[in-house]
Amino acid sequence: MVTASESWPQLLEQLLVGNVLSKENAAALMEAWLAEELTPVQTGAFLAAFRARDVQGSELAAMAEVLRKACALPDAKPNLGLVDTCGTGGDGADTFNISTAVAFTAAACGAHVAKHGNRSASGKVGSADVLEGLGLHLKAPLESVLGALPASGVTFLFAPAWHPALVNLAPLRRSLGVRTVFNLLGPLVNPLTPEAQVLGVAKAELLDPMAEALQQLGLTRAVVVHGAGGLDEASLEGPNEVRILENGNVRSDQLSASDFGLTLAPLEALRGGDLVTNQQILEAVLKGEAPDAHRDAVALNTALVLWAAGVQSDLSEGVKQALTSLEEGQPWHRLVSLRDALEGRKEE
């Protein structure tokens, strides 16, 4: 294990030649980052080295464990069988906020959703951006964040509010101008440590390491999905590659919208826009007033969440339940309920 500053060059050399860090060294590196023991040059070099080779699930899990322990949330967490819908972003597809719509739809179908999110990563508008635009208080007190779950079935955790230790790294990450290992860690460090998760990845080569990381972090059920057309959600365009974690084992599969009676559609049909446009799309989807492609994309991804959360054992039934909920506008009531619980803007 790395114990002294003079050992960091040797650790960097391991990464540069393609070696996998031990769990102990990966954890020590994260602890050093959080303690600001590394210079900006050293940190930049490590981030670039991780970018230059495929990161491993064991490395991600070890670093995520450190971040989870460092978060600002007390150990007391609700025992509700939580599920998260946070993904890596980075697909550059500029779709509307699908996973955000899924969070409220899944809640309306009976799941307890702890949505962990941030501002924009892949699109022009991140989950935090669009929810703030619709009146949610992103930095609500802990009692409000937790208190929303029993009544609303959903809560939102704004990542920077619960991971203050990462604030000092933010300027350097931005200055690098490229995505780093921290973009992969974000979906793994939900402060409420949900038992289940649906995690979208923008690149197929991330399916296995992210599934391995979730497995090592002890999740009960999870789905890691890489959508047709390069989407970090299940797509309507064609076959979607998935890794399914269940009973401690990971298996590979494919699923398509057409498997569930949904109409195939190109990515263009799911395009979003600026903040106002994405707010309008999200509101329309949740109220049951959206185009079929928007509705179907949300229903397909919601079915994965309902399976992971144990609400539905059959994906086809999950799609049907989600479609019914969307058509009745039930998810919008969940957003309004959460907005009120987080002491945001009241419905006029």
From Swiss-Prot:
Q: Give the matching Gene3D superfamilies.
A: Nucleoside phosphorylase/phosphoribosyltransferase catalytic domain, Transferase, Pyrimidine Nucleoside Phosphorylase, Chain C
Cofactor entry: Mg(2+)
Residues at which Mg(2+) 1 binds: 99, 233
Q: Its pathway?
A: Amino-acid biosynthesis; L-tryptophan biosynthesis; L-tryptophan from chorismate: step 2/5
Q: Where does anthranilate 2 bind?
A: 173
Q: What is its EC number?
A: 2.4.2.18
Q: Where, by residue number, does anthranilate 1 bind?
A: 87, 118
Per UniProt, 5-phospho-alpha-D-ribose 1-diphosphate binds at 87, 90-91, 95, 97-100, 115-123, 127
Q: What keywords were assigned to this record?
A: Amino-acid biosynthesis, Aromatic amino acid biosynthesis, Glycosyltransferase, Magnesium, Metal-binding, Transferase, Tryptophan biosynthesis
Keyword Disulfide bond included in the entry's annotation:
no
Protein name (database record): Anthranilate phosphoribosyltransferase
Purpose of the protein: Catalyzes the transfer of the phosphoribosyl group of 5-phosphorylribose-1-pyrophosphate (PRPP) to anthranilate to yield N-(5'-phosphoribosyl)-anthranilate (PRA).
- The yes or no answer to whether the keyword Lyase is present is no
Q: Which GO terms describe its cellular component?
A: cytosol
Q: Kindly state what the record says about how the cofactor is bound.
A: Binds 2 magnesium ions per monomer.
Q: How does it assemble?
A: Homodimer.
User: Organism source for this protein?
Assistant: Synechococcus sp. (strain CC9311)
Q: Which NCBIfam families match?
A: trpD
* Residues annotated as binding Mg(2+) 2: 232-233
